[in-house]
């Protein structure tokens, strides 16, 4: 039955192909000098400083709070552009709850790893979001919006936490709308929220550095 249906479908396609004398092929694109550059404040480093193990819970997840870092995108001319994030330390995510705006979250694609102990234990994870879902667009306040890559730009929604798997494109819109706007400069006030495992699980005996790293990539719209 499947072969018959397939043959029928192919026959219909062939018949359709010869129903007209011509077909139109279009090749489209856009050449532009409006290249954009992303830049993070503080050299791209979010520093939680020295964390004393003796001040942490041995058995419960330790919420270490929020830190701010700005992402500024500058373009040579007004440009519609967004960005995605990929976690370079994905294998070190601990899968523990993170305090996201007062709500505990542990959805994997919203979490980023921060490295492992010498013993191979995943230290913890953090979340990344945009403060108050607001963006400064050419000096004016606007809104954070996002669109998943498999939506192919067909829809945009109000923003939230930033996915760590490169699936969601983050961009900027005029306040109260969800349509990307062209800009020359946009500032996205990023916030990290960090949690690490209890010290009994970490079993750290020597100084251990947090080693979170993520890559931000621009996407022209």
Feature-to-residue mapping (PLM):
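Mature extracellular/passenger domains of Gram-negative fimbrial/pilin and adhesin proteins
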Residues: 19-221
């Amino acid at each position: 039955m499947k072969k018959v249906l397939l043959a029928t479908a192919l026959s219909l396609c062939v018949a359709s192909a010869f129903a007209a004398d011509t077909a139109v092929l279009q090749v489209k694109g856009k050449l532009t000098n409006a290249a954009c550059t992303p830049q993070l404040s503080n050299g791209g480093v979010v520093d939680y400083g020295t964390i004393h193990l003796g001040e942490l819970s041995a058995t419960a997840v330790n919420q270490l709070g929020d830190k701010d870092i700005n992402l500024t995108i500058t373009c040579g001319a007004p440009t519609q552009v967004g960005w995605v994030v990929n976690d370079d330390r994905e294998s070190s995510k601990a899968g523990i709850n993170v305090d996201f705006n007062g709500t505990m979250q542990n959805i994997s694609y919203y979490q980023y790893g921060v490295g492992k102990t010498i013993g191979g234990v995943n230290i913890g994870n953090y979340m990344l979001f945009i403060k108050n879902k607001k963006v400064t667009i050419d000096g004016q306040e606007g809104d954070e919006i996002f669109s998943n890559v498999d939506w192919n730009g067909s829809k945009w929604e109000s923003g939230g936490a930033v996915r760590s798997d490169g699936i969601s494109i983050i961009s900027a819109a005029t306040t109260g709308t969800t349509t990307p706007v062209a800009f020359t400069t946009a500032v996205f006030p990023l916030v990290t929220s960090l949690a690490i495992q209890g010290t009994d699980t970490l079993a750290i005996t020597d100084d251990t550095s947090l080693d979170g790293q993520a890559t931000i990539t621009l996407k022209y719209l």
